[in-house]
């Protein structure tokens, strides 16, 4: 695969799992090939193109990002060439993003990308999506893009493929995420959660279903798998719960056809073994308003359409259903066809039955759904004379009351004239039409919502069987996605608020908690702030106070009298108007009331009916009526009618008295309930280990195969995908405790930890050392060890391999033991056979001896007397054994009876306990409701009491408050006077400070005059220094020291980093100062303008300070630009440092030669430096004097800045205090005015209200006493219930004790069985000896036949009893033992009884029978064991074969390495021999290389001169810009001191300061000149690669022509296939028409046969629909072809548009270039001194211009080739136009066929109507007609199947041929490239062989073997040559630096760095003069060394 793990060395790509269906492979696995960086051959072309063209990503409006080749790279801009159109652009460098190498194409984990940027992530996702790969890992989480089509990657085979696999072993999939969470839950014993998040329509619900499907398959219990067909199985119920929730909670929206209109959290409980033991579903915020009202192009919930389209006639009659168009609540039509609705309805009913819903419950639910629709059909009108509502037609009301079990009269009265409470009495109030309509809609919404809540509770009761057994759980969250409509309401606010919380949880988990754990564990880590904190937006919504959020303000408005939606919006704007995430509407015409800036974008909200939605009021009269309904379900869901908000309470909000308000605590708003449920959900998720699945919407058109880049980029930015990948790569995502790490991986380091006790941390560190891990891959914390991504997976693989080796060793030892044991047994058998043979031979010798015969006859007679005694003793022993056996049988029977009794008692107690638990739960729920009710009442009472006290104190406090306000006003006036005095004092301090500043400036002027004198003296010394510097420059030119260059780069980088940190710190301080000053100054200005005019002088001072602030801001902006430039320079310097380090590694050989020369020259250089330092000693005193003066100036500046800062701080503090005082004064004055106006009105109302409240308080106290009495009664009842529960608990404990005793007895029996098993092992050894004695004992048994028969009968009886006992024991041990143990137990019992019989009675024949039976069983067992052994051996052989293949591959790899090393040795030896024999060849090569080196040196000199000229110009422009900025800053500073005055002398002094600063900046610029040379190297690459690009371009053009031709052939073939299919369709349709006509004739003749014919017709219609579906599929393919063609045309048009735009951009840039040239010429005139320094480069400028003209000529040729390509593209467009004509003709034919099909469909409908009319008269059925019709249908079906099979075969052949053609084309290209490469190598070798001698001919065979190595060595030599040339160029750059230092030494005393740079510029002047001399005398210069070493100059 393309995925390559970068963090773990040596990690391999995951192997492709075993059997995977072929149809699923393209959608799971990344295709291997050139794009994926396949093999060497396959991946050469993309890799070469990527390397040669330097491909990058540039922004594109259409594609998001577009590939381009980097042509030229400047300091701030770069020139790129678009890969598709070939157009060139100049873009800022920060808009260009790097491209990953081709081997990272379609990477499975985006954390592995080398270049991590938005373009690479988007390209990777787009490539995978277009290849059908919708799942991609993004660090620690998974990204899935909705494919908008069905994919075959969710079958059982795919589930089995992911089962038990680690993440890196299988492709990305939601199954892999689920498997990882499931395994983490089992291993870590930590609750897990899987969060599917994303926008609406992204696929969250589908992925949730797949997660549940996988868990139900993987974690199903073995008990459930015994009988899979039994309904009620837990896993099946869990799967069937989804269709029910989707039917009642999902609906079709604009973005999604199956959108979840509620949120759900499915908690699946697991036991300790990992099996599912129960589930629980929690739902959040059902969008109940959809049941009564839907937006345009949207539908209501699925269940309505399923019920109307899928119910039978009888059910429709029972539920009083009507067509869909008759219902007012269903504004839009059904979401799918009636056939689909019927199937979905049957599926929903079947799911309800599986979940255990009874038929009565299902009918009650459907009746309530029909009643919700009937609510909307009730029509109300307004009476003529009054506003009262009436119901002229009560038909809909009668249907509604029939469905809900209500009385029509009561319902109408409660709806139109409800009883409301006025004081203590109830009166009937007539409702207006608007109020009644609102009440009806509210009742409909509430009914559906309560039905949904009841349904969820019923599902939980069915799923949550045993919650106490759950050891841990795994939760799946599916919440409504983020929604942004044109106008959004309260439901969208709640949904988006939930998504904000989830995204904040993701950010907190990924970015904050991760880093906090690093810091907690003591790992060195720098905290990274990714800027993804969403808390401000969450606070805006949920904050309770200071200031309150949207929900708190909404709840507050619900309590206020006469509150409206408008007042709510105004209060929100007042409280949250300044919040950064809140925006007001900008224009009055805007429909939105306010906007919230969510993480996913700006959302406009319209606050219509938000107060009503938040309170959710109902008609409490109708609600009470519903509670008393005769329908059980209706009464149950309306049982809690006490806590609802009545309509009279809502009306009191608008009509009540001014001081009245509803009772607080009586009900809770929707916002409060939702906020609490969301808080519980967040707490649950925070206690789990979350796994995130980020779902992405590819387009809003719901089209498959289309991806909009901008849309996907926005979602990636919002989801924090890049940040998640970055912290996964930088951090340590895998961690494990020390103890677990040691326990799990100690097997890998067996001897690393010494014996004895050792601390866990020390043990882990020793293990890590033994594992030899890279220290960068892990960190050791305080309690855990942390690993980078992939390291733990590698350790797991090594552990698996180690465990495999150990198991193999154990198996080998076990098999060896078994083999030795079998061998010993075989030896024993052989010895026994020898004894028997010896005895038989002796018997054969003795049987004819007469004495022997006599002995055999007499010996039995001697034992007859003793035989009776022996038999009698054995009979007694046998009787004892039988008694013991009977006694044990009786004990076993008693035990079994007791166990059965205990089981019954346990079941009874469990049932009783379950009932008690349910009663206890109900009592607890009742108690909770009562407690809540009590608390609410207590709150109301306490609030009323507090209000009474507050109102009594209010009148007393108003007067005191008024006096206090007046006194405060007086204090404020006095404070203002004090502030005015302080202001005047500050003004005096300012004048004093300015005087000090003037004095400081005069001192500075004197110092600068002295400095000018010192400068003149320094110039005299510089002339002498220049002579020594010129000599040193000639010697330093030959040094080319790479070490000095590296040290310079490191010093430059360190200096830049220091400056960057300082600049950043300064910028942050300035930004903070700017923000603080902006806010404070604006507030002060507004308050001072509004409150008083006396602060005019202070405002003038504020204006002057603002001007100073603007100047400071300008300086800050300049510093920010300089910082950005330094950042760029830093990056370039780092890149140059990396290149220099690489060059350092490759140039070690060449460095040794240069090192020797450097030491010689270094000694001379040190001598010259000593002389130079002696000359500089005389200037040290002057430099020390100057440094002291500079230090004094610096200290004076610091003192001045400190005083200015103190002054500004004092002014700001004064402003702040003044502003605060004015604000408080204004606020208190306003409050006083409002209080004074409202006090008189309020006092009268309060007096009346106090009397009413006292009366109400007395009534409430009586109600409180009654509530107390009821509470006491309920507490007594609760104590009784608890007592009963305690009795049940004690009974349960006794039952548990009895059960434990029974288990102990069972364990005793099991011990006896185990002893029998041990005896079996011993008897198996004795069996062999018994079998040997059996033959001898058979002759003795002939005389004991009678006794044998008697004993045989006893034995059979005992065997029967033993069999019964064995069966009973097997039943008891079935739960603990498997079939093998049972077989061993039976065998052990048989062997035991047989042994006793042989010892006691000698009944050997019965023993023989038992032996044969045991032998048969043993043989069967042995056979099974052999089969298992054979299976194991087969698997072992397969494993060994794979291991052997792996070892072979490893050996082959080692052999290849050895071969490579051998070839390298041969190559070196051959090179030595060849060097001796090819002197002439080498001389020719050296001459050619010398000529090439001279040409390159001249080109390099020309380029260096060009670069020097351009760099000087750029430096001059930069200095001019900085000079202008400093002048502007100086003018700004001087303008702020107009009152002090300015002078010409001060301006001149400021100019000199600016020039000095410019000189310092110029020094910084010159230090960065070397880094700019890398950008100019593109010109050299362009000249080298033009021809290669031209060849590649022609090859690409030819490939595109071939691809277009292939595409045309494929389209033509598809058209032919479509025509063939259309003809076949026409034939089938003709046959169907003929069959229909025949049926019509038979209808006229045989009307009695129409029932069966109708059934057959329906089947034929199904076939016709299938064929129509196939035709639609073909039409869809034609449409896709057309769309693809249109997309190609649109892309061509877009390319032309972009070309024109870019041409205009080029013209604009040329104009800007001309303007910059004019500015540059002006700058050249201003800087005459620098023009003298670059005068030496004018001679080479003409040659550079000539070269530039040549390059422009070549570019013109390339443009002509581009025009040829455009003409070729026009030819391709013509071909596509022809294909379009063919497609249109086929479209017309298809439309004709479709019209014919429509006619046939109309005929079919007419025939159906006739059949419907005659169906009532049909009585009999004709079997013959049915048979004939079935034969016709079978024929049609067979033809259709043949056509489908033929179509599939042709499709497969077409796909296969396409693959073969593409494979052949790839192979052909590879062969062509290989042939060209071989031809080139052969030409080179042929030239060398022609120049060789006889020695070369003798070594020809060795040359053929090593020709590939020779070519590589030649390429390496060329590379070394180029690198040596690069070193030469770097030395020349050093020369330029020396020249710069010389120039600076002329200007004044310099630091060591400045002197070095001046010396480099002096050296450059020397180089320039040497180059002019060489151009004048080309033959006089020395020739270069053969290996590219620098030319030797004379010393």
UniProtKB/Swiss-Prot annotation:
Q: Quick one: where's region Disordered?
A: 1-46, 1371-1415, 1592-1623, 1905-1942, 1958-1995
Q: Which disease is it linked to?
A: Deafness, autosomal dominant, 4A: A form of non-syndromic sensorineural hearing loss. Sensorineural deafness results from damage to the neural receptors of the inner ear, the nerve pathways to the brain, or the area of the brain that receives sound information.
Where is composition skewed (Polar residues) in this entry? 1930-1942
Q: Where is the Myosin N-terminal SH3-like domain?
A: 51-101
**Native species of this protein?**
Homo sapiens (Human)
* PANTHER family according to UniProt: MYOSIN HEAVY CHAIN, NON-MUSCLE, MYOSIN-14
Q: Which residues carry this modification: Phosphothreonine?
A: 1194
- Lineage of this protein's species? Eukaryota, Metazoa, Chordata, Craniata, Vertebrata
Name-wise, this protein is: Myosin-14
Q: Does the keyword Transmembrane apply?
A: no
The record's Gene Ontology biological-process terms are: actin filament-based movement; actomyosin structure organization; mitochondrion organization; mitotic cytokinesis; neuronal action potential; regulation of cell shape; sensory perception of sound; skeletal muscle contraction
Q: Which GO terms describe its cellular component?
A: actomyosin; brush border; cytoplasm; cytosol; extracellular exosome; growth cone; membrane; myosin filament
Name of the encoding gene: MYH14
Sites of Phosphoserine modification: 60, 1969, 1980, 1983, 1989
* Coiled coil residues, start to end: 862-1947
The chain residues annotated with the modification N-acetylalanine are: 2
Q: Where does ATP bind?
A: 198-205
* Every IQ domain range: 803-832
Q: Where is the composition biased (Pro residues)?
A: 1981-1995
Q: Which domain of life is it from?
A: Eukaryota
């Amino acid at each position: 695969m393309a995925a390559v793990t970068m963090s773990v060395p040596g990690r391999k790509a995951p192997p492709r799992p075993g059997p995977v269906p072929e149809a699923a492979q393209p959608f799971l696995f990344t295709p291997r090939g050139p794009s994926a960086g396949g093999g060497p051959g396959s991946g050469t072309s993309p890799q070469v193109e990527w390397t040669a063209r330097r491909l990058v990503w540039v922004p594109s409006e259409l594609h998001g990002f577009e590939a381009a080749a980097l042509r030229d790279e400047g300091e701030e801009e770069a020139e790129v060439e678009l890969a598709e159109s070939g157009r060139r652009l100049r873009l800022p460098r920060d808009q260009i993003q790097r491209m990953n190498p081709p081997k990272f194409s379609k990477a499975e984990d985006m954390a592995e990308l080398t270049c991590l940027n938005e373009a690479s992530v988007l390209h990777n996702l787009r490539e995978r999506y277009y290849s059908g790969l919708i799942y991609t890992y993004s660090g620690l989480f998974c990204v899935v893009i909705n494919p908008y089509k069905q994919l075959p990657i969710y079958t059982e085979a795919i589930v089995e493929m992911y089962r038990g696999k680690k993440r890196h072993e299988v492709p990305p999939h939601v199954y892999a995420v689920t498997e990882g969470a499931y395994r983490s839950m089992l291993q870590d014993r930590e609750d897990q959660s899987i969060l599917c998040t994303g926008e609406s329509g992204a696929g969250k619900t589908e992925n949730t279903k797949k997660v549940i499907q996988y868990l139900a398959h993987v974690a199903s219990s073995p008990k459930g798998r015994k009988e899979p067909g039994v309904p009620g199985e837990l896993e099946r119920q869990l799967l069937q719960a989804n269709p029910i929730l989707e039917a009642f909670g999902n609906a079709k929206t604009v973005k999604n056809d199956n959108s979840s209109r509620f949120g759900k959290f499915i908690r699946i409980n697991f036991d300790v073994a990992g099996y599912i033991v129960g589930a629980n579903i929690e739902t959040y915020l059902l969008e109940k308003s959809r049941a009564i009202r839907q937006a345009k192009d949207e539908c209501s919930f699925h269940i309505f359409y399923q019920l109307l389209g899928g119910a039978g006639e009888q059910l429709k009659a029972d539920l009083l259903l009507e067509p869909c168009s008759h219902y007012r609540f269903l504004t839009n039509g059904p979401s799918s066809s009636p056939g689909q609705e019927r199937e979905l309805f049957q599926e929903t009913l079947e799911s309800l039955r599986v979940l255990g819903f009874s038929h009565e419950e299902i009918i009650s639910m459907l009746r309530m759904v029909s009643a919700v629709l009937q609510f909307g059909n009730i029509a109300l009108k307004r009476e003529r004379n009054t506003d009262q509502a009436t119901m002229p037609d009560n038909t809909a009301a009668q249907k509604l009351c029939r469905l809900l079990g209500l009385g029509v009269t009561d319902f109408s009265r409660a709806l139109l004239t409800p009883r409301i409470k006025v004081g203590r009495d109830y009166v009937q109030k007539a409702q207006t039409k608007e109020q009644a309509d609102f009440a009806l809609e509210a009742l409909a919404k509430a009914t559906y919502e309560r039905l949904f809540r009841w349904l969820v509770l019923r599902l939980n009761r069915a799923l949550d069987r045993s919650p106490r057994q759950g050891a841990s759980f795994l939760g799946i969250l599916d919440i409504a996605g983020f929604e942004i409509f044109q106008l959004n309401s309260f439901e969208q606010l709640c949904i988006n608020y939930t998504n904000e919380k989830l995204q904040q949880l993701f950010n907190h988990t990924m970015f904050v908690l991760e880093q906090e754990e690093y810091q907690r564990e003591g790992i060195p880590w720098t905290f990274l702030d990714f800027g993804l904190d969403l808390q401000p937006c969450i606070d805006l919504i949920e904050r309770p106070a200071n200031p309150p959020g949207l929900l708190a303000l909404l709840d507050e408005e619900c309590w206020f009298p006469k509150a409206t939606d408008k007042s709510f919006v105004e209060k929100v704007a007042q409280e949250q108007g300044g919040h950064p995430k809140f925006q007001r509407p900008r224009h009055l015409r805007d429909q939105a009331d306010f906007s919230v800036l969510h993480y996913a974008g700006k959302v406009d909200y319209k606050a219509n009916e938000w107060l009503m939605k938040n309170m959710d009021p109902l008609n409490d009269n109708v609600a009470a009526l519903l509670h008393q309904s005769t329908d059980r379900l209706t009464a149950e869901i309306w049982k809690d009618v006490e806590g609802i908000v009545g309509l009279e309470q809502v009306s009191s909000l608008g009509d009540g008295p001014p001081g009245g308000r509803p009772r607080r605590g009586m009900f809770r708003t929707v916002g409060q309930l939702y906020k609490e449920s969301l808080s519980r959900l967040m707490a649950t998720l925070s206690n789990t280990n979350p796994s995130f699945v980020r779902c992405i919407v590819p387009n809003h058109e719901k089209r498959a195969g289309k991806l909009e880049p901008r849309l996907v980029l926005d979602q990636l930015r919002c989801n924090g995908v890049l940040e998640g990948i970055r912290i996964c790569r930088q951090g340590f995502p895998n961690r494990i405790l020390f103890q677990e790490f040691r326990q799990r991986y100690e097997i890998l380091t067996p001897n690393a930890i010494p014996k004895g006790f050792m601390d866990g941390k020390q043990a882990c560190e020793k293990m890590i050392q033994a594992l030899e891990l890279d220290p960068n891959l892990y960190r050791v914390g305080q309690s855990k060890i942390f690993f980078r991504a992939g390291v733990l997976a590698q350790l797991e693989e090594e552990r698996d391999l180690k465990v495999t080796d150990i198991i193999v060793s154990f198996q080998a030892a076990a098999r060896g033991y078994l083999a030795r044991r079998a061998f010993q047994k075989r030896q024993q058998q052989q010895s026994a056979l020898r004894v028997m043979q010896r005895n038989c031979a002796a018997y054969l010798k003795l049987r004819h001896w007469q004495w022997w015969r006599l002995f055999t006859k007499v010996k039995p007679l001697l034992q007859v007397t003793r035989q009776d005694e022996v038999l009698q003793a054995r009979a007694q022993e046998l009787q004892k054994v039988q008694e013991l056996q009977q006694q044990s049988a009786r004990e076993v029977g008693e035990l079994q009876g007791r166990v059965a009794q205990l089981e019954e008692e346990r079941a009874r107690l469990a049932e009783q306990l379950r009932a008690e638990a349910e009663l206890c739960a109900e009592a607890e729920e009742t108690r909770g409701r009562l407690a809540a009710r009590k608390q609410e009442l207590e709150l109301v009472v306490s609030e009323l009491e507090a209000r009474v006290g507050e109102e009594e104190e209010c009148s007393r406090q108003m007067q005191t408050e008024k006096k206090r306000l007046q006194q405060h006003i007086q204090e404020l006036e006095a404070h203002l006077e004090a502030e005015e005095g302080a202001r005047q004092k500050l003004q005096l301090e300012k004048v004093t400070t300015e005087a000090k500043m003037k004095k400081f400036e005069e001192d500075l002027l004197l110092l600068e005059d002295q400095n000018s004198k010192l400068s003149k003296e320094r110039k005299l010394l510089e002339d002498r220094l220049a002579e020594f510097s010129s000599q040193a420059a000639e010697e330093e030119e030959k040094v080319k020291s790479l070490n000095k260059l590296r040290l310079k780069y490191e010093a430059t980088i360190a200096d830049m980093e220091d400056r960057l940190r300082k600049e950043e710190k300064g910028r942050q301080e300035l930004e903070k100062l700017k923000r603080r000053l902006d806010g404070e100054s604006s507030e002060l200005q507004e308050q001072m303008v509004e409150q008083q005019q006396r602060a005019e002088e202070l405002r003038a001072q504020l204006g002057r300070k603002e001007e100073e602030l603007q100047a400071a801001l300008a300086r800050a902006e300049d510093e920010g630009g300089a910082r950005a430039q330094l950042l760029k320079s830093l990056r370039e310097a780092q890149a140059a440092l990396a290149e220099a380090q690489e060059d350092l590694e490759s140039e070690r050989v060449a460095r040794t030669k240069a090192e020797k020369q450097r030491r010689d020259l270094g000694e001379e250089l040190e001598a010259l430096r000593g002389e130079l330092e002696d000359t500089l000693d005389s200037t040290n005193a002057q430099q020390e004097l100057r440094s002291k003066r500079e230090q004094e100036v610096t200290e004076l500046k610091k003192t001045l800045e400190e005083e200015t800062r103190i002054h500004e701080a004092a002014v700001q503090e004064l402003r702040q205090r003044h502003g605060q005082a004015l604000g408080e004064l204004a606020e208190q004055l306003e409050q006083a005015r409002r209080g004074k106006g409202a006090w008189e009105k309020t006092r009268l109302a309060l007096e009346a209200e106090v009397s009413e409240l006292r009366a109400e308080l007395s009534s409430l106290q009586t109600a409180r006493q009654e509530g107390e009495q009821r509470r006491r009664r309920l507490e007594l009842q609760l104590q009784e219930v608890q007592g009963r529960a305690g009795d049940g608990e004690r009974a349960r404990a006794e039952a548990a004790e009895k059960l434990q005793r029974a288990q102990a007895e069972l364990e005793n029996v099991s011990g006896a069985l185990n002893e029998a098993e041990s005896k079996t092992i011993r008897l198996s050894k004795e069996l062999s000896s018994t079998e040997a004695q059996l033959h001898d004992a058979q002759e003795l048994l002939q005389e004991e036949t009678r006794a044998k028969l008697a004993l045989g009968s006893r034995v059979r009886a005992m065997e029967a009893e033993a069999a019964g006992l064995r069966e009973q024991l097997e039943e008891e041990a079935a739960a603990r033992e498997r079939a093998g143990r049972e077989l061993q137990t039976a065998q052990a019992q048989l062997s035991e009884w047989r042994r006793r019989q042989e010892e006691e009675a000698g009944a050997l024949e019965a023993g023989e029978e038992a032996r044969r039976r045991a032998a048969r069983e043993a043989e069967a067992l042995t056979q099974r064991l052999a089969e298992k052994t054979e299976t194991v051996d087969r698997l072992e052989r397969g494993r060994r074969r794979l291991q052997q293949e792996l070892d072979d591959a490893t050996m082959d790899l080692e052999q290849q390495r050895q071969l490579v090393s051998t070839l390298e040795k041969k190559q070196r030896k051959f090179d030595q021999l060849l060097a001796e024999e090819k002197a002439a060849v080498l001389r020719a090569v050296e001459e050619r290389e010398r000529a090439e080196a001279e040409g390159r040196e001249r080109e390099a000199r020309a380029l260096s001169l060009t670069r020097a000229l351009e760099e000087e110009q750029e430096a001059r422009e930069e200095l001019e810009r900085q000079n202008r900025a400093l002048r502007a800053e100086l003018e700004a500073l001087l303008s702020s001191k107009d009152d002090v005055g300015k002078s010409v002398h001060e301006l001149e002094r400021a100019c000199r300061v600016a020039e000095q600063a410019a000189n310092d900046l110029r020094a910084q610029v010159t230090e960065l000149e070397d880094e700019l040379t890398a950008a100019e190297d593109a010109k050299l690459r362009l000249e080298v690669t033009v021809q290669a690009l031209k060849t590649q371009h022609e090859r690409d053009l030819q490939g595109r022509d071939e691809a277009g031709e292939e595409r045309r052939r494929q389209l033509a073939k598809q058209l032919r296939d479509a025509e063939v299919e259309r003809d076949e369709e026409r034939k089938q349709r003709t046959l169907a028409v003929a069959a229909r006509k025949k049926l019509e004739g038979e209808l006229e003749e045989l009307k009695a046969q129409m029932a069966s014919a109708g059934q057959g017709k329906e089947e034929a219609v199904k076939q016709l629909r299938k064929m129509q579906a196939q035709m639609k599929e073909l039409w869809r393919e034609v449409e896709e072809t057309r769309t693809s063609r249109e997309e190609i045309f649109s892309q061509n048009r877009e390319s032309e548009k972009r070309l024109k735009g870019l041409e205009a951009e080029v013209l604009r840039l040329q104009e800007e270039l001309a303007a910059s040239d004019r500015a540059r010429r002006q700058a050249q005139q201003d800087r005459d001194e620098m023009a003298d320094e670059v005068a030496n480069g004018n001679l080479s400028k003409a040659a550079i211009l000539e070269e530039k003209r040549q390059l422009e000529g070549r570019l013109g040729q390339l443009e002509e080739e581009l025009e040829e390509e455009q003409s070729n593209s026009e030819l391709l467009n013509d071909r596509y136009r022809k294909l379009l004509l063919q497609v249109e003709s086929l479209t017309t034919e298809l439309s004709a066929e479709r019209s014919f099909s429509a006619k046939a469909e109309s005929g079919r409908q007419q025939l159906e109507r006739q059949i419907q009319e005659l169906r009532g008269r049909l009585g009999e059925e004709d079997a013959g007609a049915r048979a004939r019709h079935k034969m016709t249908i079978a024929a049609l079906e067979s033809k259709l199947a043949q056509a489908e099979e033929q179509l599939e075969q042709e499709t497969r052949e077409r796909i296969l041929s396409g693959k073969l053609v593409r494979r052949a084309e790839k192979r052909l290209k590879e062969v062509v490239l290989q042939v060209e490469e071989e031809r080139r190598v052969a030409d080179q070798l042929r030239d060398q062989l022609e120049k060789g001698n006889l020695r070369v001919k003798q070594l020809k065979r060795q040359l053929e073997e090593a020709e590939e190595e020779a070519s590589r060595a030649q390429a390496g030599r060329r590379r070394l040559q180029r690198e040596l040339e690069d070193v030469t160029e770097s030395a020349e750059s050093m020369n330029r630096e020396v020249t710069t230092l010389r120039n600076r030494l002329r200007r004044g005393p310099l630091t060591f760095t400045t002197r070095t740079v001046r010396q480099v510029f002096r050296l450059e002047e020397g180089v320039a003069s040497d180059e002019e001399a060489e151009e004048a005398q080309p033959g006089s210069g020395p020739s270069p060394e053969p290996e590219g070493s620098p030319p030797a100059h004379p010393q």
